């Protein structure tokens, strides 16, 4: 899966979960600062990423995912 395909799938998940316009999401979008996500929101989102992409994201790695770009990079580098 290409980086662009991953980015678009992640944007879809974010738009559904955080009720934001998909077009407003960039790789620099910060989950906590820009989307007002709290720690529970982030845990739920990480679980959705795991389901969507079939990847397991350890807690120590999940803590490093602060932006949409971080999520894209992690999925890209850990896909089968």
Swiss-Prot record:
Domain Carrier per the UniProt entry, residue ranges: 4-79
Gene3D superfamilies from the UniProt entry: ACP-like (1.10.1200.10)
Places the protein is found: Cytoplasm
InterPro entries: ACP (IPR003231), ACP-like_sf (IPR036736), PP-bd_ACP (IPR009081)
Gene Ontology CC terms: cytosol; membrane
Major subcellular location class: cytoplasm
Family annotation (Pfam families): PP-binding (PF00550)
One biological process term in Gene Ontology: lipid A biosynthetic process
Modification type O-(pantetheine 4'-phosphoryl)serine: residues: 39
Entry keywords, A to Z: Cytoplasm, Fatty acid biosynthesis, Fatty acid metabolism, Lipid biosynthesis, Lipid metabolism, Phosphopantetheine, Phosphoprotein
Domain of life: Bacteria
PTM remark: 4'-phosphopantetheine is transferred from CoA to a specific serine of apo-ACP by AcpS. This modification is essential for activity because fatty acids are bound in thioester linkage to the sulfhydryl of the prosthetic group.
Pathway note: Lipid metabolism; fatty acid biosynthesis
Gene Ontology MF term list: acyl binding; acyl carrier activity
PANTHER family named among the record's database cross-references: ACYL CARRIER PROTEIN, CARRIER DOMAIN-CONTAINING PROTEIN
NCBIfam families per record: acyl_carrier, PRK00982.1-2, PRK00982.1-4, PRK00982.1-5, PRK12449.1
Similarity section: Belongs to the acyl carrier protein (ACP) family.
Function: Carrier of the growing fatty acid chain in fatty acid biosynthesis.
Protein name stated in the entry: Acyl carrier protein
Organism: Lactobacillus acidophilus (strain ATCC 700396 / NCK56 / N2 / NCFM)
């Amino acid at each position: 899966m290409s980086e662009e395909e991953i980015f678009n799938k992640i944007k879809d998940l974010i738009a559904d979960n955080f009720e934001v316009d998909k077009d407003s999401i960039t790789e620099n979008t910060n989950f906590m600062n820009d989307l007002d996500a709290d720690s529970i929101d982030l845990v739920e989102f990480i679980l959705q990423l795991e389901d969507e992409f079939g990847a397991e994201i350890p807690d120590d790695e999940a803590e490093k995912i602060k932006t949409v770009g971080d999520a894209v990079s992690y999925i890209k580098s850990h896909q089968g």
